[in-house]
Regions:
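A beta-strand edge to alpha-helix "cap/lid" segment located at domain peripheries
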Residues: 1-28, 35-135
Length: 135
């Protein structure tokens, strides 16, 4: 059975492949059930494995020559559920054009199944500047 730390390492490697146009390794880490969801970094959401799988293929196809750095803000597991809260910083090509760094706030929710951990939800959105509540 894959430990949570091993799974997080696999996810890091899979995301590196993802930002180079290959969704396959990341998709292998997902549950393939009707209850999986993704709130994608380009907006919108998908529910159910067929829709999530399509979205992951579409998103990965937009990337190339990329690198992702992951800064973990927190993670934990209890029983058959686990989560991670990260800042993902990506550089590379999007739609064939070079871009600067993009930072995303990302939460993964995972469930233990089939002898290891599987992603059941990803929420990603752009990390914007912090607004001062006093102003």
């Amino acid at each position: 059975m894959s430990s949570w730390d091993e799974f997080c390492g696999q996810r890091r490697g899979a995301l590196e492949r993802f930002v180079n146009g290959d969704a396959g390794p990341y998709k292998q880490l997902w549950s393939h059930g009707d209850d999986v969801t993704i709130f994608g970094g380009w907006g919108g959401y998908e529910q159910g494995w067929d829709a999530v799988s399509w979205r992951l293929d579409w998103a990965a196809s937009r990337f190339g020559e990329g690198h992702v750095g992951i800064g973990n803000l927190g993670a934990g597991s209890s029983g058959d559920l686990a989560y991670s809260i990260d800042i993902e910083r990506n550089v590379g090509l999007v739609d064939g054009a070079s871009r600067g760094e993009t930072a995303l706030r990302v939460t993964h929710i995972c469930q233990r199944a089939g002898g290891g951990w599987r992603i059941v939800h990803r929420h990603a959105d752009r990390l914007g500047p912090r607004e001062d509540p006093a102003s």
